[in-house]
Amino acid sequence: MSRIGKKAVAIPSGVQVTLAGQTVTVKGPKGQLSWTIADEVEVKQEGAELLLAPRVDTKRAKGMWGLSRTLVANMVHGVTVGFEESLELVGVGYRAAMKGTALSLQLGFSHDVDVAAPAGVTFAVPKQTEIKIAGIDKQAVGEIAAKIRRIRPPEPYKGKGVRYAGEKVRRKEGKKK
């Protein structure tokens, strides 16, 4: 029995959920998201709640049950509140700037690195060493944040690089003479 899957997904006021076969569409004040649920999982709407249940009793169906419930809950949260990820640039001369809707990063390379914002994701640069990524799709926000971090991940000796806000970088001791 999935402890996550058996919880109902609450639908707040102002959010409209449409079920068309296995496709769930969620409309809210921030936008619209759509996702096709695996065939092993059944979706029912009862009042202001969405209930999910496995159609068959297999290991895959149970796994997809919890996953589907979490993804639908993330869709509802995304269209009401949205998701945000913060990145910090640590290092001498490391800075970020907006270039239209794209992000221009100076990360110690001989050239600037430009990152285009995918659909539904926006960048903000409150300080030169801070990047805020916002959007309604949790996967898209997390994926672009990971992509930016991968350009120059924090190194263990000095801690320089792009890191998530609040991330603790495990430091190593340098070689001894």
Curated annotation (Swiss-Prot):
Disulfide bonds: none annotated. Keywords: Ribonucleoprotein, Ribosomal protein, RNA-binding, rRNA-binding. Residues 157-177 are annotated as: Disordered. The keyword Metal-binding does not apply. PROSITE patterns: RIBOSOMAL_L6_1 (PS00525). Transmembrane segments: none annotated. GO terms for molecular function: rRNA binding; structural constituent of ribosome. InterPro entries: Ribosomal_uL6-like (IPR000702), Ribosomal_uL6-like_a/b-dom_sf (IPR036789), Ribosomal_uL6_a/b-dom (IPR020040), Ribosomal_uL6_bac-type (IPR019906), Ribosomal_uL6_CS (IPR002358). Coiled coil: none annotated. Gene3D superfamilies: Ribosomal protein L6, alpha-beta domain. GO terms for biological process: cytoplasmic translation. Part of the 50S ribosomal subunit. Belongs to the universal ribosomal protein uL6 family. This protein binds to the 23S rRNA, and is important in its secondary structure. It is located near the subunit interface in the base of the L7/L12 stalk, and near the tRNA binding site of the peptidyltransferase center. This is Large ribosomal subunit protein uL6. It comes from Caulobacter vibrioides (strain NA1000 / CB15N) (Caulobacter crescentus).
